[in-house]
Design a protein with these regions (language model features):
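Catalytic cores of secreted/periplasmic lytic hydrolases that degrade extracellular macromolecules
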Residues: 1-95
Length: 95
């Protein structure tokens, strides 16, 4: 995984600090959906979710500012998503 701290911040934000039902019941850390059905993927273990993030999202990344790249590809619908990722990163930096 490239930019693991940012990816961790994404997982934290997407799952509400790993408390969401999607995380707990389906082991989906990133809100990944099947583009054909629009349904959330279900994984047997959280590590499968990380692998899926790499193969379905990060494989497109060719370098540069990762946060800007996430914004450019429209990773999240929330227009404040990148600001929220930065907020989580700052929080993690204080830990």
């Amino acid at each position: 995984i490239r930019h693991p701290k940012i990816v961790l911040a994404q997982a934290i934000l997407e799952t509400g600090w790993f408390r969401s039902p999607l995380c707990r019941n389906r082991h989906n850390l990133f809100g990944l959906t099947n583009p054909k059905t629009g349904k959330y993927y279900e994984f047997n273990h959280w590590t499968e979710s990380v692998r899926a993030y790499y193969t379905k999202v990060q494989y497109k990344y060719k370098g540069g500012n990762y946060l800007l790249w996430l914004h450019k590809i429209g990773y999240a619908e929330d227009p404040r998503y990148i600001r929220e990722i930065i907020r989580v990163l700052k929080h993690l930096g204080k830990s």
